[in-house]
């Protein structure tokens, strides 16, 4: 998630980049390198936001279900859980990961500043970003951000989410309320049933102005607790089936 600050400084190699973000008191989406930051950790290009370009969503799938990546800096030396997450996805879906040679479209995986966890959504024929700051080097968080790279939006912002969860806007910090907007139906393909345990759902106190006492959202289903991806160690069966459906994976179980 990109922090709610007036200015965000990221370290990329030896280059310091100063990013003007939206003030924490507003509900305007901040920007990063020409992308709009949606829902806290999704980078999306402006041309992908208009209804007339909704067909572009079909082109956001990685060609041949192969994600081309480049590990940089710290992660090039210590790929650890990143490679483990890649193997977990490969073992359960038709998605493959390939180290970049000279491909035009690829995802650069790098160590962002502090809690800077975010990723471009899906495929684009240029360099894309997957930032894993020091607070994001956790297996479940890595899987979550890779889910965005694959093309998955958040489960709690599905257009039909109100049937399954209740968002308590009064409990959410002003600068975090934008992270709970429903994704427009023309931007996302709703696949399968709502998954309370998805790797793509936030914990129920994320963005709360008082996490010890106030929930940002909660399940409408009695007895269900919404848990952050940082405490998870795998994709759920529904996550896997959704990815296999999105990429029409041959020989894999899919939603009809």
UniProtKB/Swiss-Prot annotation:
Keywords: Disulfide bond, Hydrolase, Metal-binding, Metalloprotease, Protease, Secreted, Signal, Toxin, Zinc. Binds 1 zinc ion per subunit. InterPro entries: Astacin-like_dom (IPR034035), MetalloPept_cat_dom_sf (IPR024079), Peptidase_M12A (IPR001506), Peptidase_Metallo (IPR006026). SUPFAM superfamilies: Metalloproteases ('zincins'), catalytic domain. Residues 53-250 form the Peptidase M12A domain. The keyword Protease applies. Pfam families: Astacin. Expressed by the venom gland. Its cofactor is Zn(2+). Its EC number is 3.4.24.-. GO terms for cellular component: extracellular region. Monomer. Zinc metalloprotease. Provoques deadhesion of endothelial cells from cell cultures, and also degradation of fibronectin, fibrinogen and gelatin in vitro. Its role in the venom is not fully understood but it might act as a spreading factor that facilitates diffusion of other venom toxins. Alternatively, it might be involved in the proteolytic processing of other venom toxins or it might play a role in extra-oral digestion of prey. This is Astacin-like metalloprotease toxin 2. It comes from Loxosceles intermedia.
